Amino acid sequence: MKLLKIGISGVRGIVGETIVPELVMDFASAFGTYLQAKKVLVGRDTRISGPMLHEAALSSLIATGCDVLDLGICPTPILQFMVRKLEAGGAISITAGHNDLKWNALTFIDQEGTYLNVFQGEEVLDIYHLGKFDKAAVDRLGKLEKTENYLDNYFACLKKYLNAEAIRKARLKVIIDPCSGAGAGVIDVFSRYLGFELIPVNNEPNGYFPHDPEPRPRNAQEVASVMKVIKADVGFLLNSDVSRISIVAENGEMLSEEFTFPLIASEYLKRKQGTVITNLSSSRMIEDVTRMRKCPLMKAKVGQSYSIQMALYEDAVLAGEGSGSVAVLEFQPAFDGFLTMGFILEIMASRKKKISELVAELPRYHIVKEKIYCPPTKVHSVVHEVKKLFIDRKMDSSDGIKVEDEDGWVHIRASATEPMIRIIAEGRSRENARERAEEVMNFILTLVK
């Protein structure tokens, strides 16, 4: 079965099967028609399918009458920042984030630099399904402009927002692995602006990912292996569009991506209190942190668009997910890996503490993340069947099924990006978390054989 995942903020699939130039042209035409000839920005990650899809999107937007500013290879958070900076009508980011090389996607961004909300997404999808796209006359075709100076715009603002002087004085040695994605090369500019010593790993923007581009401990072996040898202070892993990060401590410990958001929140909420948004699959660490800082916590469905839209609606100060995504709303309403890394460096510099010492201040839980392949036609019926396991338990059904008790929880949901059912379980011990996950996994396997 060919896989195409259509969501409120874009479309994702396997290149050559469902993600083909014709489909990209139709979706870009729908988005251009929705924007009504406003300026639109386009950027992409380094995937080898990127140039093909990029050109298809550019031509289709121009055909609808939109002026297009082409940023080329560009991390998604920088693209989002530039939408607001240039007062554009929106943007398309061509990236599949944490998915492997065979995948690619179009992500639609509105004039505020955020992913489309449900209502905006439905409008674009309606236009796409109707197939009635604006077709500009020859004298009204959009204009194409290319730019390469956007990095200085972004990093100058980031430097001003952070305490760059404290970071520079700390003389931090930092390893960053952008996985040959959109952050490759850009991390050099990042280091120059903030004044730390950069040791890059996989810093060639060639699109051939040397490992799975999901920032998780299992992909951190290369960074962890050299941490002690070169006496680095911290290491970071990035996904292909720099919207998510994970951390490697100076002692070589490959930290779960679940630590990223609580680490930021614990420090930020000392400075500015307010509502915090997370999702249903994130660790209880963030619950403990917000309780300690006396700040309200609200939970959205899993998906960056849902978290950001709830954050805007609730006037939240922070949003984040257990995937390593963090948004500081006063900087921009977007998950931003550069801001996340910079803020962690600022915490280390200002508090004069090692990353292992900062993480030790956080509560510790054990989390297990698994996924099981499930044909798209069966996903929702399988998730529904799982309810029978917990018929006598209180459950949250707002996004799949989540069952909690005093010692932990398990969350079962259909993936929005892959033909998978995700099972995430957390407990006070690794054994407890594993037991919760395996109970569900064994049941699901009987249904998908």
Which ranges hold each PLM region?
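N-terminal small/polar loop signature for handling phosphorylated ligands or for N-terminal nucleophile
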Residues: 29, 39-103, 189-248
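An N-terminal, well-structured beta->alpha segment
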Residues: 1-65, 89, 143-174
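Gly/Ser/Thr-enriched, mixed-charge loops and adjacent short helices
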Residues: 1, 14, 104-230
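Gly/Ser/Thr-rich active-site loops/lids in small-molecule metabolic enzymes
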Residues: 117, 200-202, 253-273, 337-350
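Proline/glycine-rich low-complexity loops and linkers
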Residues: 122-156, 160, 249-322, 326-328
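General beta-strand structural signal in soluble alpha/beta enzymes
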Residues: 6-7, 42, 68-73, 93-94, ...
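Phosphate-binding and adjacent anionic-ligand microenvironments
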Residues: 234, 271-449
